[in-house]
């Protein structure tokens, strides 16, 4: 009769359980090892790839910025080169070996272990591609910077004279007057965006100043001016002239000596009885000068001609606000005639009285052409 050992079955069960536990422990150990290995591999590479992705994003943002400027075609070649470099980088970054490496799925990361050598090679190539992309982004942003600086150098002095409030124009001038250096292309892009925004704000202020100017001109032209000398006494004529300039935010300054732009004491041809100075520091922007030592001052001060003279000088100012200079290109050698036409057309100065008072002075003589040029300036065409 066979011997029956009741403990043998229990022993076998125990051994089976132990075996299963060992297998599970091995599997868990392998899984933990693979998880740690893949996580470590991804952790070592992710900061590098994030840096490269930052370079790529800056490149894309730089293209978008350049394409949004006034004349993006001038940057077309640079944009195309940056786009090519970005495409080169994207082809590498989109490789399946890199996607396996960075996947949140453990199974895919484990598969990625089979491509370790290829991953290293691709990542090395990505570094080169990102470096090239960063360099070409710098070329693009440098071209944008140069174009913006050129526009600034051509127009900043004009903008400063044109705007009613010079705060932002002075800020723009101050920023361009400083040496600018950047630690990264992202920093350079941020600064150029800021400069562009500031420049756009200043240009909008110029447009607003011109619009306000035209409204004020209409208000000044609406002020009634008596026709005869005896209608007002000298104080009355001066008060009327003051009311006209005040409408424009301007004041009259009486002086005994011609003094404009370093020409102190000089009165061209002895003709000037009133004048307006265009000074780069805006110090004379809102001032009209009356030369009380002019031989005809006593007579002028008792007549509506005083108001016409003031309107002529205000027209110099209006042309400056519109064009950034009292002598715009479109006026050519007819600055004074065009200014007279402007005073008649937009300030309501008396054409016949002006012609009579300036008879024989050819450069001041108005005609249809000077009227046409004055209208063009008022409409925003400075030549």
Where are these regions (language model features)?
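Amphipathic alpha-helical assembly segments used for oligomerization, scaffolding, or translocation
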Residues: 12, 17-225
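Second-shell loop/turn segments in exported
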Residues: 223-232, 294-304, 325-333
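Post-HExxH zinc-binding segment in Zn-dependent metallohydrolases
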Residues: 329-370
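Terminal targeting segments of Actinobacterial cell-envelope proteins
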Residues: 1-15
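Active-site scaffold of zinc-dependent metalloenzymes
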Residues: 265-305, 317-321
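Pan-zinc metallopeptidase signature
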Residues: 207, 211, 374-383
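Active-site recognition of the HExxH zinc-binding catalytic motif
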Residues: 304-324, 339-340, 344
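Auxiliary, metal-adjacent structural segments of Zn-dependent hydrolase domains
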Residues: 221-286
């Amino acid at each position: 009769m066979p011997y029956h050992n009741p403990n043998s079955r229990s022993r076998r069960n125990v051994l089976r359980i132990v075996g299963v536990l060992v297998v599970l422990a091995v599997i868990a150990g392998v899984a933990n090892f693979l998880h740690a290995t893949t996580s470590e591999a991804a952790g070592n590479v992710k900061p590098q790839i994030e840096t490269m992705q930052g370079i790529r994003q800056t490149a894309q943002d730089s293209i978008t910025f350049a394409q949004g400027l006034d004349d993006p075609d001038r940057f077309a070649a640079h944009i195309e080169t940056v786009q090519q470099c970005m495409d080169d980088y994207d082809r590498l970054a989109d490789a399946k070996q890199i996607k396996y490496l960075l996947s949140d799925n453990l199974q895919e990361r484990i598969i990625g272990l089979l491509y370790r050598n290829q991953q290293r090679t691709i990542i090395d190539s990505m570094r080169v591609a990102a470096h090239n992309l960063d360099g070409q982004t710098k070329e693009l942003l440098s071209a944008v910077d140069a174009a913006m600086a050129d526009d600034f150098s051509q127009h900043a002095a004009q903008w400063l004279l044109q705007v009613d409030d010079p705060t932002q124009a002075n800020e723009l001038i101050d920023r361009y007057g400083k040496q600018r250096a950047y630690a990264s292309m992202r920093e350079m892009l941020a600064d150029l965006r800021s400069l562009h925004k500031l420049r756009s704000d200043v240009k909008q202020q110029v447009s607003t100043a011109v619009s306000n100017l035209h409204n004020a001109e209409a208000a000044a032209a609406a002020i009634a001016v008596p026709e005869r000398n005896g209608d007002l006494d000298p104080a009355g004529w001066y008060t009327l002239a003051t009311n006209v300039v005040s409408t424009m935010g301007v004041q009259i300054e009486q002086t005994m000596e011609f003094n404009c732009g370093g020409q102190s004491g000089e009165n061209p041809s002895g003709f000037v009885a009133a004048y307006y100075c265009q000074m780069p520091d805006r110090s004379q922007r809102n001032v009209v000068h009356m030369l009380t030592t002019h031989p005809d001052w006593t007579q002028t001060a008792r007549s509506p001609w005083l108001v016409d003279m003031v309107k002529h000088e205000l027209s110099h100012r209006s042309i400056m606000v519109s064009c950034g200079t009292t002598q715009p290109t479109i006026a050519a050698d007819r600055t004074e005639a065009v200014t007279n036409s402007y005073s008649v057309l937009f300030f309501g100065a008396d054409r016949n009285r002006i012609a009579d008072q300036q008879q024989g002075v050819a450069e001041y003589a108005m005609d249809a052409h000077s009227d046409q040029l004055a209208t063009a300036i008022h409409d925003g065409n400075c030549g």
